[in-house]
């Protein structure tokens, strides 16, 4: 039975980058990884209404730099920057090192896979039909430049007794092409019937490598020209129609005996 590989992990070091960018010794690695998971869970709950797509954590020497990608940066910053200062103080208390927080805006939230998944789960929690939510998200993504999108929902859809899986796809979604820019997102909706999982794949085109850019070549004239002969040298028969061609009008013919005499008469 075929299973789907995680699109981001499949493309790491090819066209994707890690969400946690730091190095640690074997004794410290587990603790720092657990710290990153706790920070992401905290930010997900704290900034639930800020439409956060992803969080990148970097650890330079004895510092931490957290970049939050959000489609509503004003909600994260707050009035006169009060909310972000409180957020920075809480992160410093949790991580134990000075923390620098950067906010990056997501220009097109309709084509961000994580934001699409979060939007669908919020609609499911408000008892909106899952088919309507999925098709509306697909239409918005294709309208704003996505080349393909696939959405899959699994669980007790519409409150049925037996859980099932339904998915819809529009456009092209190449999952095993490494140069394909596939954005992947996952979210869970906590409904009264149970948890419904939503997965989203968005295809945004191909990544062109440094040497893969198409080169536009000028059209060349492939017709071979015969080099010119010096003046004053002509082959016999040149200048008459068909005289310089094999099998022409005057080639291969022999004058009939007595033809000149008949023409002179």
Curated annotation (Swiss-Prot):
Annotated Pfam families: KH_2 (PF07650), Ribosomal_S3_C (PF00189)
Bias kind Basic and acidic residues: ranges: 221-239
Domain KH type-2: 39-107
Coiled coil region boundaries: none
Example GO BP: translation
Keywords: Ribonucleoprotein, Ribosomal protein, RNA-binding, rRNA-binding
Residue ranges with Gly residues bias: 240-251
Keyword match Ribonucleoprotein: yes
InterPro entries membership: KH_dom, KH_dom-like_a/b, KH_dom_type_2, KH_sf_prok-type, Ribosomal_S3_C_sf, Ribosomal_uS3_bac-typ, Ribosomal_uS3_C, Ribosomal_uS3_CS
Superkingdom of origin organism: Bacteria
Positions of the UniProt region annotated as Disordered: 211-265
Gene Ontology MF annotations: mRNA binding; rRNA binding; structural constituent of ribosome
GO (cellular component) term, any one: cytosolic small ribosomal subunit
Assembly notes: Part of the 30S ribosomal subunit. Forms a tight complex with proteins S10 and S14.
PANTHER family: 30S/40S RIBOSOMAL PROTEIN S3, SMALL RIBOSOMAL SUBUNIT PROTEIN US3C
Family named by the database record: Belongs to the universal ribosomal protein uS3 family.
UniProt function note: Binds the lower part of the 30S subunit head. Binds mRNA in the 70S ribosome, positioning it for translation.
Protein known as: Small ribosomal subunit protein uS3
Organism: Cupriavidus necator (strain ATCC 17699 / DSM 428 / KCTC 22496 / NCIMB 10442 / H16 / Stanier 337) (Ralstonia eutropha)
Lineage, highest ranks first: Bacteria, Pseudomonadati, Pseudomonadota, Betaproteobacteria, Burkholderiales
Gene, per the UniProt record: rpsC
């Amino acid at each position: 039975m075929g299973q789907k590989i995680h699109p981001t992990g499949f493309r790491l070091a090819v066209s994707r980058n890690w969400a946690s960018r730091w190095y640690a010794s074997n004794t410290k690695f587990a603790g720092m990884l657990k710290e990153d998971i706790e920070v992401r869970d905290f930010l997900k709950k704290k900034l639930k209404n800020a439409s956060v797509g992803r969080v990148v954590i970097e650890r330079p020497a004895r510092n931490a730099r957290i970049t939050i990608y959000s489609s509503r940066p004003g909600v994260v910053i707050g009035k006169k920057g009060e909310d972000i200062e409180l957020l920075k103080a809480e992160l410093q208390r949790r991580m134990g090192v000075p923390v620098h927080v950067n906010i990056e805006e997501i220009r097109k939230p309709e084509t961000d896979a994580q934001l699409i998944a979060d939007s669908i789960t919020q609609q499911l929690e408000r008892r909106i039909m899952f088919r309507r939510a999925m098709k509306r998200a697909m239409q918005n993504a294709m309208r704003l430049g996505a080349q393909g999108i696939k959405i899959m929902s699994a669980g007790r859809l519409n409150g049925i007794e037996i859980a099932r899986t339904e998915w819809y796809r529009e456009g092209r979604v190449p999952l095993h092409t490494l140069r394909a820019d596939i954005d992947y997102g996952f979210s869970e909706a906590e409904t009264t019937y149970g948890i419904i999982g939503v997965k989203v794949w968005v295809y945004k085109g191909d990544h062109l490598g440094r040497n893969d850019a198409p080169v536009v070549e000028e059209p060349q004239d492939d017709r071979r020209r015969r080099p010119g002969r010096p003046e004053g040298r002509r082959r016999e028969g040149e200048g008459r129609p068909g005289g310089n061609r094999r099998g022409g009008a005057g080639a291969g013919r022999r004058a009939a005996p007595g033809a000149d005499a008949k023409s002179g008469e």
